[in-house]
Amino acid sequence: MKQLSDKLPFLEKAGYSAADAAANFVFMTMILFQLNFYTDVFGLSASAAAAVLLWPRLWDAVFDPIMGVLADRTNTRWGKFRPWILWTAGPWAVVMVLAYTTPEGWSSGMLIAYATITNMLLMTLYSMNNMPYSALGGVITADLNERAKLNSFRFIAVNIAQFIVGGFTLPLVAKFAMGHDRRHGWQVTMTIWAVLCLVLFLVTFFTTRERIKPVSDVKSSPKQDFADLLKNSPWIVMFLMTLFHFAILSFRGGALYNYYHHYADKVAMYDLLDGFGLTETSGSVQAGASFVDFIGYRVHGARADLGNSNVADVFNSIINITGTSVTITVILLSPSLARRFGKKAVAVTGFALSAVNSFAIYW
C-alpha cells in the first residue's frame, strides 16, 4: 500500500470526476425534462406520466440497500467498486437511449408499460453505477486532503455536466427534430449524451486505482446501523435538506419548462433573442454564427408565426445556462467567503438567498 500522504496525479483526479459528470447527464435530464418529455413528446397523460415516474423511484428505494451489499461483497482484480463502473457503462448507454425513444403505433397501455420498464431499468443502472462510484473515493486514497481535492474535481465536473444538459439539450432536440418530429430529436440528442456518458465512464475506470482495502471483519447489523442514524441529528438535518433540495429542483425544472413552452409570451422571448442576433431574421452578422447554428441556438420561424418555432427551447436553455453560470461563480467564491465570514454564515446566507429566489421565480 502507498503512503497515505501520497499525492494523487492530476489525471486521476480529473478522471475520477468524469463518472459523476456522466451520471448527471441522466440525473439532470430527469430533473429538467423527463416529465415534459412523457407528456409533450411521448404522448402520456399527466397522471400516467406521474405513475411512470413514481414506480421506479419506489423500486430505487428498495434496490439501493441491496446494491450497497452487492458492491461491498464484490472482489475482483480491479477492486470492489471500479468494476461496477465498467460493467454498467454499456447497458447504461443503451437504456439511456431507449428511455427517450418513442415507439410508433403503440397503444397507450403499451407506451405506459414501455416507459415504466425503461425508466426502471435506467434507475436500476444508475444505482448500480453511482453507489459504487460514491464509495470509490474512499478507497483511492486515505489522505483527507487528497479526498477533499477529489470532491472538488467531482463538483466541478458535475456543474459542467449540468451546464451542458441544461443549456444544450432542448436546442439540439429542436435542431434534430428538423421542425416537426421532436421524437426523433430526442432520440438523436440522447444518443449523443449516451455516447459521451460511455466515454466518461471508461475514462474513470481506466484512470483510477483502488489503493485502500476496506476493513471486512467489522460486524454490524442493518438494524443497529439504522438506529444509530436516527440518533445522529446532523445526519437527519442533512438528509432533510438534501430531500427538499432535490424536490425543489424537480418542481422547478418541470415548472420552468411548462411556463416557457405553454404560458410565456413567445413574441417577447423572440424580440429579446432577436436583440442578441439569435433569430433567422437578425440583421447582424455574428462572428460565431455557424457555431450558433451548429448547437441549435438559432430561432427558426417568423415573428408572426411562432407556434412551432424553437423560441421557447432556446430561451429556456439560456435561462438554465445563466443559472448554472451563477452557481459555478458562487462555488469559486465560496472558499474565500467561508474564510472571511465562516462556513455556517455563508451556508445560511446562501440558503436564504436561494429561498428568496425560489419565491421570486413564481411571483
Q: Regions from the language model: what does each represent?
A:
Residues 2-363:
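Membrane-embedded alpha-helical bundles of multi-pass transporters/translocases
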